[in-house]
């Protein structure tokens, strides 16, 4: 593992996340925060993610064809999850006919003063994505 640069390994995991593995979004977000100066603890976390990948090689995205498009979305946030900055991480996931079509996990730009405010900020980001996906789906259907 010493021959593989930390940033390259995180980048490879990020590629998997973007292409086929939304379950890696939170882990990539945390690992990438320490890319400039990883310590042994960060390497251990990276190895843990790689072991997870090894044990879940058959996981991936699955799409089904259906007559009507059904878009379902989920959003969540952790209030003040970053101990140093007290900023929250919010995320969302959207499924179209059961298959993931959009997902994101991102540290919020502002500090939420309550868990309710935190959840509303996450919901706002998810709603913007839902509107875009709805318009896109309608245009695709013609």
Swiss-Prot record:
Residue window of motif RxLR: 48-51
Known function: Secreted effector that completely suppresses the host cell death induced by cell death-inducing proteins.
Comment, domains: Has the canonical translocation RxLR motif, but lacks the canonical EER motif, which characterizes most oomycete effectors identified so far.
Organism lineage: Eukaryota, Sar, Stramenopiles, Oomycota, Peronosporales
Coiled coil: none
Compartments, as annotated in UniProt: Secreted; Host chloroplast envelope; Host nucleus
Stored PANTHER family: GAG-POL-RELATED RETROTRANSPOSON (PTHR11439), PEPTIDE SYNTHASE GLIP-LIKE, PUTATIVE (AFU_ORTHOLOGUE AFUA_3G12920)-RELATED (PTHR11439:SF483)
Recorded family membership: Belongs to the RxLR effector family.
Leader peptide range in chain numbering: 1-27
GO terms for cellular component: extracellular region; host cell nucleus
Keyword match Iron: no
Name this protein carries in UniProt: Secreted RxLR effector protein 161
Key words of the record: Host nucleus, Secreted, Signal, Virulence
